[in-house]
Amino acid sequence: MRCPYCGNVETTVVETRESDEGDAVRRRRRCSACDKRFTTYERAELAMPAVVKKNGDRREFDREKLRASMTLALRKRNVSVDLIDAAIARIEDKVFTSGASEMSTSRIGEMVMRELKRLDKVAYVRFASVYREFEDIDAFSKLIQEI
């Protein structure tokens, strides 16, 4: 497993247990190069609904794209990787258990916004400003008033 901090491929498993939700194996790992610890989750591969973009294109659900967008919104915010991973797992679970064969990016985006609102209000506003394509300061003000 590649270290997300330094890119080293030599890591060791420090602890293994079932996730709180019971749908994954949670592993705490330590990098042999930088000595930092990180968490990974091992899950059964499931057939997720196709994601329908605004222009009608269909794509496979991409967990890493979800992680990247949430991580960008949470950049320089004090939110642990474990909390981010748990939020991503909740979103994935909602997408999978919806039973739908397709899901719009707008529906997934709303799920992301709910999770970010729980994790960090600043990240929520950051994500919403891009996701909802804010054009002016009034849109920011309105969203902040809703919080």
From Swiss-Prot:
Gene Ontology molecular-function annotations: ATP binding; DNA binding; zinc ion binding
Family annotation (InterPro entries): ATP-cone_dom, NrdR-like_N, RNR_NrdR-like
Zinc finger (unnamed): 3-34
Boundaries of every ATP-cone domain copy: 49-139
Reported cofactor(s): Zn(2+)
Cofactor remark: Binds 1 zinc ion.
NCBIfam families xrefs: transcriptional regulator NrdR
Family to which this protein belongs: Belongs to the NrdR family.
Protein's UniProt name: Transcriptional repressor NrdR
Organism per entry: Leptothrix cholodnii (strain ATCC 51168 / LMG 8142 / SP-6) (Leptothrix discophora (strain SP-6))
Protein's gene: nrdR
